[in-house]
Regions:
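Hydrophobic/aromatic ligand-binding patch that stacks against planar heteroaromatic rings
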Residues: 60, 80-81, 122, 179
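N-terminal flexible segment immediately upstream of the FAD-binding catalytic core
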Residues: 1-59, 75-106, 135, 144-145
């Protein structure tokens, strides 16, 4: 079995057949980004439903030697949402759960596919993002594409080699979280994001 077919078969077992898109007509919507630039048609668009599925899909890509790109809502204007040649696209829009919210701590943990505008509905009167109001796209895409975000309190990350790691801002040592905003997925895929509320103003 060639690598593309093997990866698609594995992804269907991991995510369910309905969440692995291979028909060219259906894949065409994943070719462009927020500026309507077009990339190559991916071999498949894979829509995992949670962190374990992302971990397994990335591990399958590594095992089969299949290149992959990661996409949220596809609104990026920096090319980060475009497919790679002869590869697959991991699409995170199914991952829209609010994992935990603490009004007392002014923190919220969400999956990467949550729209930024939805955060205020979970914890009222808190401000989570600089920039447009409401911000477009997804929380994961905003973090991956925007350098200098300073209110990330924690990340659950699937690394490019398929390993899972949990990072917290209070952890001693190097600031690994600080390297993640603006990395465009090169540092891994954030499958859960903890944000601290920004100061008023």
């Amino acid at each position: 079995m060639e690598a593309g077919a093997e990866l698609v078969a594995r992804a269907r077992l991991i995510c369910g057949e309905q969440h692995v898109i291979t028909a060219p007509a259906a894949l065409s919507v994943f070719r462009s980004d927020g500026l309507r630039r077009e990339g190559p048609l991916p071999l498949a668009a894979i829509l995992p439903g949670g962190a374990p599925e992302v971990t397994s899909v990335v591990a399958a890509c590594v095992a089969t030697g299949m290149p992959y790109a990661v996409r949220g809502a596809g609104t990026s204007d920096r090319g980060g949402a475009l497919p790679v040649a002869d590869g697959v696209l991991i699409v995170l829009t199914r991952m829209r759960r609010m994992v935990a919210a603490s009004a007392a701590d002014d923190e919220i943990t969400v999956e990467p596919g949550v729209p930024p505008a939805a955060l205020g509905q979970a914890v009222q009167a808190a401000r989570w993002f600089e920039g447009p109001d409401p911000p477009i796209g997804t929380v994961g895409g905003h973090i991956a594409e925007t350098p200098g975000i300073t209110n990330v309190g924690g990340l659950d990350v699937v690394q490019p080699d398929g390993r899972f790691v949990r990072l917290r801002a209070r952890d001693p040592g190097y600031d690994l979280i600080g390297a993640f905003p603006g990395s465009r997925g090169r540092a891994g895929i954030a499958v859960a994001i903890t944000l601290r509320a920004l100061p008023p103003g």
